[in-house]
Amino acid sequence: AHLVGIGGVSMSPLAEVLHGAGMVITGSDMRESPAVEHLRSLGIPVAVGHRAENLGDAELVIRTAAVHDGNPEIAAAHDKGIPVFERAQAWGAIMRGYQHALCISGTHGKTTTTSMCTHIIMAAGLDPTVMIGGTLPLLGAGHRVGKGDTIILESCEYCNSFLSFFPTIAVILNIEADHLDFFKDLEDVERSFRRFADLVPEGGRVIANRDDANTMATLAGETRPVTTFGLEEGDIHAAGLRWDKGLPSFDVIYQREVYAHVSLK
């Protein structure tokens, strides 16, 4: 596979995951960068500048939404009949290789929540593959390639990217009228999130914020199992919330019993 814009924040982790899975990867980017140097250190050839000859013998091409059809490498791929996929489609294909795919969505809080889930799942020894839209100190990066059967992805609604995913657990933190350069209005955003929830297969689950009215309205009538969470209401909620030096701690209540005590640090 050849990745156009391979040095990007969302493309370099993709290259690492595909490389780790044994796929032959090449790429190109407009400039040198630490990400490009890192990929080269892994044995992935990266060309600087976009030229048709960079495709080599690639059997498929992956690009970000920012790379348009006028790009010489994309144009050459179309001319040669080489299939071209968006980055989100590639992540979706990767997810199918995992038994558990935890996809965390929402207008706000995605990076923080994905990071916290990564801490928890790694502490449980599950060795997940992770893609986060920011740098997590625990990882020293925004991604990791694991060998377990779990993948955790920050899942963005912009351009309906998350509709290319295959979540077994779809988390919706909140929904607001955002990215209105793409969506028409709040209702259009809500339709996208409903379609995201509907991607969950039999045996999967939707996790939703009980405190967010738009999220609950969006999921009204949802046929997939929905588990809600909230500060005071929800299937899972907090009790005994207190603050110590600006940091919260609380009991997690599940099925009317204390499931765990949480202290954020």
Q: Which residues does each predicted region cover?
A:
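ATP-dependent carboxylate-amine ligase
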Residues: 1-45, 57, 61, 79-82, ...
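Short polybasic amphipathic segments
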Residues: 248-254
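Short linear Ser/Thr-Pro motifs
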Residues: 10-12, 33, 64, 156, ...
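Short coil/loop residues immediately preceding or within conserved phosphate-binding loops
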Residues: 99-101, 247, 259
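Short amphipathic alpha-helix with an adjacent loop that forms part of the alpha/beta core around
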Residues: 50-57
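Short acidic/polar mixed-charge low-complexity motifs
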Residues: 149, 232-234, 256-260
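Beta-strand->loop->alpha-helix junctions that form or flank phosphate-binding loops
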Residues: 28-30, 47-50, 85-92, 130-134, ...
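Phosphate-binding loop of NTP-binding sites
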Residues: 17-20, 40, 54, 65-210, ...
